[in-house]
Structures are given as structure tokens and as C-alpha cells.
Amino acid sequence: MTLDEYILQHIDAEGDYLHALWRDTQLRLSYGQMASGHLQGRLLKMLVQMIKPLKVLELGTFSGYATLSMAEGLPEGAEIHTFEVFDENEDFLREWFEGS
């Protein structure tokens, strides 16, 4: 059994919304391989759940996969702020953030 297989057997399943976002990222954005995926997303969610921050600052949103993964782990009333320098991703990000 590979390390990836072991990890995938012991972490939360990827939700339908995040899976759809990852797929849409691959289809619509240049450099889709830069997107965080299931393993990275679950790690970020777990870290946020352990630390329980009231505010998170993310620099580099890209497709928003990591952003939404961290948001899943935030406590009630917490905030996440994210910045992306590539303005061509803005419409894509708004679509997915507003739908979340």
C-alpha cells in the first residue's frame, strides 16, 4: 500500500462541492495543476480545526479550493480573508464562493 492510498483511507471524503470545484478548475483555469486537491484540502481543514482561529489570512487564492477547505474547519463566527493577484480569476472565484 502506498502512502497516498493509506492517507486516502483515513481522511474525510471529499465533498461533492469541493470535487466539482476541483474539476471545474481543471477545465476552466490555466495552470489547473496549481490547485490544492483533496489531500491538501483535508490537511488544511484539520489544521484549522486544531488551531480554531478566529481569523485566517490566505495569500494566493487561485481557484479557492484551499479557501473553502479551510472554511469548512473554521469555528462559528470566524472569518477567512483571501487575496489573489490574478484578476482574471475573479469571476470564477465569485461564482464558486457565492455558491458555497
Description of each model-found segment:
Residues 1-100:
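A short alpha-helical cap/connector motif
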